[in-house]
């Protein structure tokens, strides 16, 4: 347990460094210490980066017991959008550790919180969930709404994660989102389209 002292130090630079190493190595057994560190960092509004790495580490090391706590954090008034996205990706990632469970994804889609929706969609991509036709169509009906398409090319919009995951999808569904995406004629989007059209994961929008 090489990183306990850093995680429990209360010092943001040390906490962030430890979380990044745990994330990189997917080191198991740090769950309680990651929880403790996250509790401390959530009290620091400007510590979004350490919060992000702690949440990614919790997800990547399968700390499923943390889901109720993470959901409670979503109820807070959090000043940084990145933290909402990080919370959402961690929750959806953990809830799909063993079996497919899209309930939180749909809760997020109903939330009208851009960052939360992006995080939930990121988990679909990162867990390589092959959406059933009904789920694909429902999720597409949300992520293609104008409010989720703002600032194309400047932010990672929710639909980009569904596009990136579409290399796994049946041809009909993949073509549907590719056709939708072509309208933007944006370099990053066009690169993802090229990847999925070849049936491969270009790993261009992975969060961790």
Name the predicted role of every residue range.
Residues 10-12, 42-47, 78-82, 112-114, ...:
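Short inter-helical turns and helix N-cap capping residues of alpha-solenoid HEAT/ARM repeat scaffolds
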């Amino acid at each position: 347990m090489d990183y306990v002292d850093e995680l429990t130090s209360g010092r943001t630079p040390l906490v962030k460094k430890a979380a990044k190493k745990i994330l990189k190595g997917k080191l198991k057994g740090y769950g309680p210490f990651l929880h403790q560190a996250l509790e401390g960092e959530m009290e620091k509004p400007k510590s979004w980066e350490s919060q992000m790495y702690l949440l990614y580490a919790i997800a990547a090391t399968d700390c499923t017991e943390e889901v109720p706590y993470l959901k409670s954090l979503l109820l807070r008034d959090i000043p940084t959008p990145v933290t909402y996205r990080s919370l959402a990706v961690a929750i959806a990632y953990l809830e799909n550790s063993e079996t497919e469970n899209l309930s939180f994804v749909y809760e997020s889609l109903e939330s009208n919180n851009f960052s939360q929706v992006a995080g939930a969609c990121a988990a679909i991509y990162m867990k390589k969930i092959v959406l059933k036709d009904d789920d694909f169509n429902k999720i597409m009906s949300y992520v293609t709404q104008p409010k989720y398409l703002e600032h194309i090319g400047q932010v990672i919009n929710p639909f980009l994660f569904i596009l990136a995951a579409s290399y796994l999808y049946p041809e009909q569904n993949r073509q549907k989102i590719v056709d939708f995406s072509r309208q933007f004629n944006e370099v990053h989007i066009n690169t993802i389209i090229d990847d999925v059209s070849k049936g491969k994961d270009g790993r261009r929008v992975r969060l961790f």
